[in-house]
Amino acid sequence: LSNQGDEVHLRDLARGVLRALPETLSFQKGLWNLARFAPDRPASIGLRLEEIARRDPQRTALLFDEHRWTYAEFNAWANRYAAVFRAHGVSAGDTVAILMENRPEVLACVAGAVKLGAIAAMLNHNQRGEVLGHSLTLTKPRLVICGGECREALESSEFHPGTDRKRIYLWTGPGKAPAGYRDLEAETSGKPATNPLETQQVLPKQPCFYIFTSGTTGMPKASVMTHYRWLRGMAGLGQMTMRLKPDDTLYCPLPLYHNNALTVSWGAVLGAGCTLALGRKFSASRFWDEIRRYDATAFCYIGELCRYLLNRPATPQDREHLVRLIVGNGLRPEIWEAFQQRFGIEQIYEFYGASESNLAFVNAFGLSKTAGFCPMPFAIVEFDAEEEKPRRAGDGYLRKVKRGEVGLLVTEVTDKAPFDGYTDKKASEAKLLRDVFKKGDVWFNTGDLVRDQGWRHIQFVDRVGDTFRWKGENVATTEVEGALNAFPGIEQAVVYGVEVPGADGRAGMASLSCAGSGFDGAALARHLRAQLPAYAVPLFLRLRAEQETTATFKYRKVELKRAGFDPGQIDEPLYVLLDAQQGYEILTPALFASIGRGELKL
């Protein structure tokens, strides 16, 4: 599905550069930092925090509920935690696992750990049992820090004080530390608030975090984030792109175990020496109240967050806020302008980058409907959707797509853009492509389909696993979702491919959440036929009160694909499109059986 109207032209870049001219000082600062950070010269998150605490000690570093910490206070807090960790034997290269919901203690624990050269394993507090145990096994922590709100989650795994005598378990309220746990706050009392000497020795090439994949398609993998990548993100996305000022406040309701919070949001804040307002979790109903409460001038988004806000009823207060810019990824082109206009957002800094990726794209010039550009080596290559792998030509090498076309994004692995990979070496190797354009070259397979917009800009289209083939054509689920979401009454649409007996490829199916109880199958079919090629129109629909997502707003498609369109297995309304004029009709068990026998043409 092409979208030639979203190409980037020279005039767009010229306008973007002119808009950025008044802030060239911040841009130059970021450029200078990008140039000066070297893998083998001391520089780290801890040193950056200490630098701000020394230069601007009374500046507010963190807001949470009614609480406030200056940079001097927050740095001292992190130092006391570092002293506790050191007393328990933590040193450079060790892992400190953190299992808490969003609260200031998470950031203080992270800062304390990385100041020692240790690695913070950012556990997903939604995980339970075997999955959580798998995450802990991958990272082999010396210490596990558990918030009181996560005790049930931790003790559902094999890693807890009742069964594990190898590790030390620290507890941070609410409530008194249970048997087997040591009280972190009690142990902090009396510890020195001075900067640890170890911080001076931490090198950018050392790991700082383990960030876990969402696990929507299997067990999570632990991707490695180094200080080098974090610092480059701070400089490139924070200082060069967002260009926050010391008196700015960025609101982040995203989970701190995710890079959009820990690297993008916190990195941008530390890059400017401004304030982070931390939300407990995202709530569409409370979002703008929190923005006004903290006088936030920026916020970070991910995935469907913007759509959730746009789906809320419009109010006269929609523009009563101080937000001038937002940063994130996953804002769909079809709602970009509507969101920007309704809420009066001056600049949207969309970016592209995965936790394990070796480079990122940033929308430095504030252009519309783009994930931005990247100066580092990348290519967009032809992709075989049926085989789900890049297509090699007769000479064995890959071929680039033309401007305006969609292909697989691959990025070259070099000394300046290293691939840090996962803790699992086999999983790391599986993400690499070799002999791509010449013998011996190595490229990272992002697993994402993007559109070449020209001038080194890209637009995200789909995850590889979310693209399917039907009637000999490739169907990008996100573009079908865009057409569905444009239909009145549809609040959420999740599109995926399902197997049909006797048919090649996969037929399109959509799981929908609609406002009210009415559903006009004929009108929806007409709308989709006008918006999409015939092969891309979903043949099956499933109505749900609400779509299931991960904690980072990624739709859980695996279960939907597995369930298919069998009314005997699904207790929610199902529809099928057998006649384009008649529209969608109820999928009965009799119709399902006829489809299974190949009696109905789809």
Predicted segments with their positions:
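Conserved pre-ATP/AMP-binding loop-to-beta segment of ANL
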Residues: 57, 176, 189-212, 219, ...
